[in-house]
Every structure is written in C-alpha cells, then in structure tokens.
C-alpha cells in the first residue's frame, strides 16, 4: 500500500514474511537515512517489489509503487555480480580464458567518465578501493566487483539504493567490511533498502 503523502510503502502478503519499507518520515519532510530491511523467504516477492519500486511502476492489484516525491531509486541484484553493462560477456570470457598477452580493460578505462566525480572519490575511500583504477577487470575479486556496482549506482545520486541479497558469496571478513561500508553510507546520507531472506542478516 502507498501513502502518497508520507511516502510509506507497506508490502503485506501471505508469501512475504515481514515487510514495511519507510522511504520518508511521517511528516513527509524528508527521506530517513539508514538501512531498512525487507525480509521474506525465497520466492516471496522481494525482488519483484524492488523492481517495481526501482522502475517506478504501480501494481494496482497489490497497491504497490512509490511516491512521485522520490525521484531516484537504484536497485542492484547480486545474483550475478559480474553484470556491468557492456562488459559482462568480456569479463566472463576473460576471467576464464584470458592469457597474459590478451588486452584486458582496466577499471579506469571502463569508468573513465566517472573517475573525477566527487561521489566516486568519496565512496572509493569508504569501500577502500583506492588506486583500483589501474587494476584489470578480470583480476577483481567478487567483493571488489560488488563494491564497484554500488559506487557505479551511487554516481547517479540515488535517493534510495535497493540491494537484493547483498551478502551472497561474502566470507566473514568481507561481510564485516561490507557492513562497515553500509554504516558509512548511512552517515553520508544514503538511504539503503536490503532485500533479505534471513532475519539474522539484518545489519545492526
């Protein structure tokens, strides 16, 4: 259900175990900063909800959507963290088959139009990705690729960042780094929505 005045989105379903996403405070005076979890079992409709919000579509049967007052919502699904636009085929091929003599694009060559952005610099520091610009794309770890996906989305200055299954494939150390980065995103004024399966994954 949408309260278009207060920008409160509620997703109530027999399939979705939990879920109320608040993208603004009740006064409607702004979007609260922090991490909002939406939790449900596999197949409960979390990703569908995220896609509806990110694309600005209303599903009148379930009364889902988002307020016109929220102009920029970005969603990242981590089921395939190598899905950078335009380089996914290259990455998958070169990750498995590239030789030392093959030419492979660097991070700087792929994102050259964004490297001078204050947003890029800010979040590169938050995610500890300094000097990653010279690294070849096929040598990036899954964690580095995940962080680049987020920075790439943040360069578009979203009001809300929706992260679907953000902990897939992360070991304990990487997960700790990721949680710390999320805290810093909150401190820097970014609203984050996590789509999760396990209540224990809700960040503290």
PLM region spans:
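A short, proline-enriched helix->beta-strand linker immediately N-terminal to the Walker B motif
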Residues: 155-159
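Catalytic Walker B motif of ABC-type/P-loop ATPase nucleotide-binding domains
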Residues: 161-165
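ABC ATPase nucleotide-binding domain signature region
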Residues: 50-114
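Helix N-cap at the start of a conserved alpha-helix in ABC-type nucleotide-binding domains
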Residues: 172-173
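Conserved ABC ATPase signature
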Residues: 136-140
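H-loop/switch region of ABC-family ATPase nucleotide-binding domains
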Residues: 195-197
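Conserved ABC ATPase "signature" region
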Residues: 116-132, 154
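Hydrophobic anchor residue at the start of the ABC signature
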Residues: 150
């Amino acid at each position: 259900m949408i309260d278009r005045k207060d920008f409160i989105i509620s997703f109530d379903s027999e399939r979705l175990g939990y879920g109320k996403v608040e993208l603004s405070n009740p006064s409607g005076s702004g979007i609260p900063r922090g991490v909002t979890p939406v939790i449900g079992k596999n197949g409960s409709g979390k990703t569908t909800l995220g896609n509806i919000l990110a694309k600005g579509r209303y599903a009148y049967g379930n009364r889902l959507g988002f307020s016109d007052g929220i102009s920029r919502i970005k969603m990242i699904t981590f089921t395939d963290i190598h899905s950078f636009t335009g380089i996914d085929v290259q990455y998958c091929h070169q990750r498995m088959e590239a030789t030392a003599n093959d030419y492979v694009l660097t991070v700087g060559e792929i994102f050259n139009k964004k490297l001078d952005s204050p947003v890029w610099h800010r979040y590169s520091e938050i995610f500890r990705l300094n000097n990653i610009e010279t690294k070849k794309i096929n040598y990036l770890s899954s964690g580095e690729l995940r962080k680049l996906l987020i920075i790439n989305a943040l360069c578009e200055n979203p009001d809300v960042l929706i992260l679907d299954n953000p902990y897939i494939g992360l070991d304990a150390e990487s997960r700790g780094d990721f949680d710390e980065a999320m805290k810093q995103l909150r401190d820097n004024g970014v609203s984050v929505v996590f789509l999760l399966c396990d209540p224990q994954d809700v960040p503290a």
